[in-house]
UniProtKB/Swiss-Prot annotation:
Gene from which this protein is expressed: torA
Cell location: Periplasm
Reactions this protein catalyses: trimethylamine + 2 Fe(III)-[cytochrome c] + H2O = trimethylamine N-oxide + 2 Fe(II)-[cytochrome c] + 3 H(+)
Cofactor note text: Binds 1 molybdenum-bis(molybdopterin guanine dinucleotide) (Mo-bis-MGD) cofactor per subunit.
Stored InterPro entries: Asp_de-COase-like_dom_sf, BisC, CT_DMSOR/BSOR/TMAOR, Molybdopterin_N, MoPterin_dinucl-bd_dom, Mopterin_OxRdtase, Mopterin_OxRdtase_prok_CS, Prok_Mopterin_Oxidored
GO CC, alphabetical: outer membrane-bounded periplasmic space
Protein name stated in the entry: Trimethylamine-N-oxide reductase
EC top class named in words: oxidoreductase
EC assignment: 1.7.2.3
GO molecular function, one term: electron transfer activity
Amino acid sequence: MKNKDSLHVSRRRFLAQLGGLTVAGMLGPSLLTPRSARAADAVAPGAATKEGILTGSHWGAIRATVVDGRFVAAKPFEQDKYPSKMIAGLPDHVHNAARIRYPMVRVDWMRKGHQSDTSQRGDNRFVRVSWDEALDLFYQELERVQKTYGPSALLTASGWQSTGMFHNASGMLARAIALHGNSVSTGGDYSTGAAQVILPRVVGSMEVYEQQTSWPLVLQNSKTIVLWGSDMVKNQQANWWCPDHDVYQYYEQLKEKVASGAISVISIDPVVTSTHDYLGRDKVKHIAINPQTDVPLQLALAHTLYSEKLYDKNFLDNYCVGFDQFLPYLLGEKDGQPKDAAWAEKLCGIDADTIRALARQMAGDRTQIIAGWCVQRMQHGEQWSWMVVVLAAMLGQIGLPGGGFGFGWHYNGAGTPGRKGIILSGFSGSTTVPPVHDSTDYKGYSSTIPIARFMDAILEPGKIINWNGKSVKLPPLKMCVFAGTNPFHRHQQINRIIEGWRKLETVIAIDNQWTSTCRFADIVLPATTQFERNDLDQFGNHSNRGIIAMKQVVSPQFEARNDFDIFRDLCRRFNREAAFTEGLDEMGWLKRIWQEGSQQGKGRGIHLPTFEVFWNQQEYIEFDHPQMFVRHQAFREDPDLEPLGTPSGLIEIYSKTIADMQYDDCQGHPMWFEKIERSHGGPGSQRWPLHLQSVHPDFRLHSQLCESETLRQQYAVGGKEPVFINPQDASARGIRNGDIVRVFNARGQVLAGAVVSDRYAPGVARIHEGAWYDPDKGGDLNALCKYGNPNVLTLDTGTSQLAQATSAHTTLVEIEKYTGPMDNVTAFNGPAEMVAQCEYVPASQGNPHD
């Protein structure tokens, strides 16, 4: 009981001293200094400048320069010929005012524990504690929740985290928590939630994260490329593993082909994208579709292909099932409305003749459909994904070089020929060691829920929802643990999140920046960035170009610790340290990962040097023999020997499996469903006339690097996140370029800086996702976000009962020039640290139950 007693003594001493302090009295003199001015306190003077330190990141490999112990510059790795502009912000990722410096506990939670006033979450008042105390509190809460409620009350989540095969927060969080007890797991993700559920039903695989046809073959064989909601040039800057950016050489070649007229590119998008602009504003045919009406356009294209006998009947007969069940809907035999070009014109805002001409062009020669992810991130996003496949099937070019469809062209260097190399392993989230609390009694609740519906579980526990053919009873969550993720960035409708957060008893966040998730947490633990540790990573994703050493650039800042060390010490508190570490430290794990890769290589005729030679001398190795690849070629060449993973083994234009689910919002074949809200004459557009896009940003990866002042200086407008708006819409509202505006709807309000641009169609506005939430009244529902997080405005509803994915792009807003008080942006300043000197008795290093 020594550990437990120490914890109680510590809290009593804290409370005794806290009671006599005012807020002003709790602020120590040094803490009155702005955090930005105190950032240098973390840097110990060094003896020399270090240059050329090789490491990697989501934005590419770099050579780092360190002066006096401080990461001051990032230069592109010499093997990256197309480096991202975002690497300029990487030093800020380490040294900025929003770094989490110490373990912190929310003031009222420190007073009352899990019985705290949860409406105070977000008030940004925290107490600094020692690592021992923070981990004791973490462990105590895990124990309490498992003993009081069981596994149905605990949810853990991770996300994009940092690069590195070993230091992955998701695996470490999963292993540590699983060694203590079971918990609620999640399925799906926020990027491709609708597509990744529907496509396995239609073509037998997820498609969204898979390799695409090699670009050299596309450039050689395609005559028409249709970019449908895909912005490759912008989005390929950042990848899951360290990108090599080789794919940009093919964009250069595509630009040359477009300029010469050898390839025609058509962009179906409400916006002139970065890719469209790069290939040539006047060279790319722009079909500026009304938002959320892509399915009517697809149906009209299919109708034209069928009615004008431009479709490939042989392909439909031999490689597909269900076209005959789909056809009556397409022709209007079911509902009296043919889904022809004249019908679609009224919804899409695209001339019927243009629609018919597009269908003829696509059928006229080899056509590659390049589909992005943004379109499926709206209500009924499954239908658009399904129709992409149907159109490609009707064209009959699936499995041919430069033809067919693909959903991952903008991600992970897709289309770059893959090399014959090895893929390193990493730190697994599972072990064979049983947990301390081995209960699998979820008390009738589901043990797995769709990630995009986790707020429903918090707000409506016990509610039964459908999900991909299953019935899910949402569990009554009481505690959440987040590592390497930021739900306040990735989840929709922030005021609904805040409402749900008030129902949780304990929230723990492990991160390196004071994101909104951390500000709304009870216990915050400071993790290192990838630049403060050693690791290994792939160089190139689909290209599998090589392996790179991620060398430590600077020492861990302040009291930040590696996730590995955080969870190791947590596991020590319940006698699972050995199971967590497997007896290895950081370098021990890197050697094991390397040795496993070496064994893998031997089976492929690849010889790797010893780890010591690689780490100390080479730092980078490159694989040979790029392999050309055609997506779905094997299936086309022999559908009997190479069937798809569908029940029929063929492309399912009609799915009996889905039809048997009897969902009214996702039936047996693709259909057009009206949205809850839609611009350009759709539901809700009279009150909220502007469609809001919240697509991937150009200067960060989701919310990562929003803390970089270096990068914000390149895009922020008046210190706010920019909102892009069409000149007609701006003029009608008296808005000029550079004005601070209020963007609002019934769900919330944000401030943003206006950028007036004709790249955006009338009725369409954009705020990039990942902007940090900055409420003027922290923790209050309906606060004004002073910086411009679009998820204050987005709608939290499932795409359908099939995928239950995010519908972020089903969002309408209004915009007006802002004339109210202009408070300073404080999102990037870190917390208001409440200082009370309290003695803490260190926890026992042995078994806390001794």
